[in-house]
From Swiss-Prot:
One GO BP: translation
Full protein name: Large ribosomal subunit protein uL18
Quaternary structure, from the entry: Part of the 50S ribosomal subunit; part of the 5S rRNA/L5/L18/L25 subcomplex. Contacts the 5S and 23S rRNAs.
Molecular function per GO: 5S rRNA binding; structural constituent of ribosome
Keywords for this protein: Ribonucleoprotein, Ribosomal protein, RNA-binding, rRNA-binding
Organism expressing this protein natively: Ruthia magnifica subsp. Calyptogena magnifica
rRNA-binding listed as a keyword: yes
Gene that produces this protein: rplR
NCBIfam families assigned to the protein according to its UniProt record, in alphabetical order: L18_bact
Classification of source organism: Bacteria, Pseudomonadati, Pseudomonadota, Gammaproteobacteria, Candidatus Pseudothioglobaceae
Amino acid sequence: MKLSKKQARLRRATKFRAKHAQGSTKRLCVHKTAQHIYAQIISPCGTKVLASASTLTAKLKNGGNVDAATKVGKEIAKAATSVKVIKVAFDRSGFKYHGRVKALADAAREGGLDF
């Protein structure tokens, strides 16, 4: 039976998380909806959020587009460096590395994150 788009995305996300579950690297986890984009840096054990940024904040309230994703990427990089996190694994949650996800990743790299 063919998987739906959502099931296929969740399957890709699960595969990544299973591979990196035992690692000692923190994850930069990205989630996007039609109107917003969210980014979190999660501890290696997966139980604690170390830093977060999204388009729900007052500064980035209007927009879920590529420009807003770039701003979220810069914001998450700034928040990560404030808690002394530099090296992360990029968890795109099964989304294609294209458009808003790519813009967020590029901005986070420019901000000082290494992945």
